[in-house]
Protein backbone atom coordinates (compact mmCIF):
# COMPACT_ATOMS: atom_id res chain seq x y z
CA UNK A 1 0.00 0.00 0.00
CA UNK A 2 1.35 3.41 -0.98
CA UNK A 3 1.95 5.96 1.72
CA UNK A 4 0.36 9.41 1.71
CA UNK A 5 3.68 10.86 0.52
CA UNK A 6 3.85 8.52 -2.48
CA UNK A 7 0.16 9.03 -3.18
CA UNK A 8 0.67 12.81 -3.41
CA UNK A 9 3.39 12.36 -6.01
CA UNK A 10 1.26 9.88 -7.90
CA UNK A 11 -1.50 12.50 -8.24
CA UNK A 12 1.03 15.05 -9.52
CA UNK A 13 2.38 12.49 -11.99
CA UNK A 14 -1.13 11.71 -13.26
CA UNK A 15 -1.86 15.42 -13.76
CA UNK A 16 1.47 15.87 -15.54
CA UNK A 17 0.78 12.97 -17.88
CA UNK A 18 -2.75 14.19 -18.59
CA UNK A 19 -1.47 17.72 -19.15
CA UNK A 20 0.93 16.41 -21.79
CA UNK A 21 -1.24 13.67 -23.28
CA UNK A 22 -4.53 15.54 -23.80
CA UNK A 23 -3.14 18.42 -25.92
CA UNK A 24 -1.01 16.00 -27.96
CA UNK A 25 -4.04 13.79 -28.64
CA UNK A 26 -6.25 16.79 -29.48
CA UNK A 27 -3.70 18.26 -31.89
CA UNK A 28 -3.03 14.89 -33.52
CA UNK A 29 -6.75 14.19 -34.00
CA UNK A 30 -7.25 17.68 -35.41
CA UNK A 31 -4.43 17.18 -37.88
CA UNK A 32 -5.75 13.76 -38.96
CA UNK A 33 -9.41 14.77 -39.29
CA UNK A 34 -9.17 18.21 -40.90
CA UNK A 35 -9.63 18.65 -44.62
CA UNK A 36 -6.41 19.49 -46.40
CA UNK A 37 -6.67 21.58 -49.57
CA UNK A 38 -3.45 23.59 -49.86
CA UNK A 39 -3.35 26.46 -52.34
CA UNK A 40 -1.11 29.39 -53.13
CA UNK A 41 -3.71 31.85 -51.82
CA UNK A 42 -3.75 30.16 -48.42
CA UNK A 43 0.04 30.37 -48.16
CA UNK A 44 0.18 34.17 -48.61
CA UNK A 45 0.40 36.61 -45.73
CA UNK A 46 -2.93 38.15 -44.70
CA UNK A 47 -2.83 41.95 -44.42
CA UNK A 48 -6.41 43.13 -43.75
CA UNK A 49 -7.67 41.89 -47.10
CA UNK A 50 -5.02 43.83 -49.02
CA UNK A 51 -2.62 42.06 -51.35
CA UNK A 52 0.77 41.86 -49.58
CA UNK A 53 3.34 44.20 -51.11
CA UNK A 54 6.50 43.02 -49.34
CA UNK A 55 7.89 40.05 -47.47
CA UNK A 56 6.41 39.42 -44.02
CA UNK A 57 9.76 38.38 -42.54
CA UNK A 58 11.22 41.52 -41.01
CA UNK A 59 14.45 41.50 -39.03
CA UNK A 60 14.41 43.28 -35.69
CA UNK A 61 17.46 44.46 -33.83
CA UNK A 62 18.37 42.29 -30.82
CA UNK A 63 17.85 45.19 -28.40
CA UNK A 64 14.09 45.01 -29.01
CA UNK A 65 14.06 41.39 -27.86
CA UNK A 66 16.06 42.28 -24.76
CA UNK A 67 13.71 45.15 -24.03
CA UNK A 68 10.71 42.83 -24.46
CA UNK A 69 12.34 40.28 -22.16
CA UNK A 70 12.85 42.95 -19.50
CA UNK A 71 9.20 43.93 -19.86
CA UNK A 72 8.10 40.33 -19.36
CA UNK A 73 10.31 39.97 -16.28
CA UNK A 74 8.83 43.05 -14.63
CA UNK A 75 5.34 42.10 -15.74
CA UNK A 76 5.74 38.74 -14.02
CA UNK A 77 7.03 40.61 -10.98
CA UNK A 78 3.67 42.33 -10.67
CA UNK A 79 1.98 38.94 -10.85
CA UNK A 80 4.01 37.87 -7.81
CA UNK A 81 3.60 41.14 -5.93
CA UNK A 82 -0.17 41.48 -6.33
CA UNK A 83 -1.21 38.37 -4.34
CA UNK A 84 1.36 39.24 -1.70
CA UNK A 85 -0.06 42.75 -1.37
CA UNK A 86 -3.61 41.41 -1.08
CA UNK A 87 -2.70 38.89 1.65
CA UNK A 88 -0.10 41.07 3.40
CA UNK A 89 -1.94 41.12 6.76
CA UNK A 90 -2.06 37.34 7.02
CA UNK A 91 1.50 36.61 5.87
CA UNK A 92 3.48 38.53 8.45
CA UNK A 93 7.08 39.67 8.68
CA UNK A 94 8.65 36.63 7.00
CA UNK A 95 6.74 37.28 3.76
CA UNK A 96 7.69 40.95 3.93
CA UNK A 97 11.38 40.01 4.10
CA UNK A 98 10.96 37.52 1.23
CA UNK A 99 9.29 40.13 -0.97
CA UNK A 100 11.93 42.68 -0.07
CA UNK A 101 14.66 40.24 -1.18
CA UNK A 102 12.70 39.50 -4.37
CA UNK A 103 12.33 43.19 -5.25
CA UNK A 104 15.99 43.88 -4.41
CA UNK A 105 17.07 41.06 -6.76
CA UNK A 106 14.96 42.55 -9.54
CA UNK A 107 16.35 46.02 -8.89
CA UNK A 108 19.90 44.64 -9.03
CA UNK A 109 19.04 43.09 -12.41
CA UNK A 110 17.57 46.39 -13.58
CA UNK A 111 20.68 48.28 -12.43
CA UNK A 112 22.86 45.77 -14.30
CA UNK A 113 20.79 46.22 -17.47
CA UNK A 114 21.00 49.99 -17.05
CA UNK A 115 24.77 49.83 -16.56
CA UNK A 116 25.16 47.70 -19.70
CA UNK A 117 23.06 50.34 -21.55
CA UNK A 118 20.40 47.83 -22.56
CA UNK A 119 17.70 50.43 -21.97
CA UNK A 120 19.37 53.07 -24.13
CA UNK A 121 17.79 53.36 -27.57
CA UNK A 122 20.48 55.37 -29.34
From Swiss-Prot:
Function in brief: NDH-1 shuttles electrons from NADH, via FMN and iron-sulfur (Fe-S) centers, to quinones in the respiratory chain. The immediate electron acceptor for the enzyme in this species is believed to be a menaquinone. Couples the redox reaction to proton translocation (for every two electrons transferred, four hydrogen ions are translocated across the cytoplasmic membrane), and thus conserves the redox energy in a proton gradient.
GO MF terms held by the record: NADH dehydrogenase (ubiquinone) activity; NADH:ubiquinone reductase (non-electrogenic) activity; quinone binding
Membrane topology: Multi-pass membrane protein
Reaction equations catalysed: a quinone + NADH + 5 H(+)(in) = a quinol + NAD(+) + 4 H(+)(out)
Protein name: NADH-quinone oxidoreductase subunit A
Subunit structure: NDH-1 is composed of 14 different subunits. Subunits NuoA, H, J, K, L, M, N constitute the membrane sector of the complex.
NCBIfam families: PRK07756.1
Bilayer-spanning residue ranges: 10-30, 66-86, 91-111
Endpoints of the signal sequence: none
Main location per the UniProt record: membrane
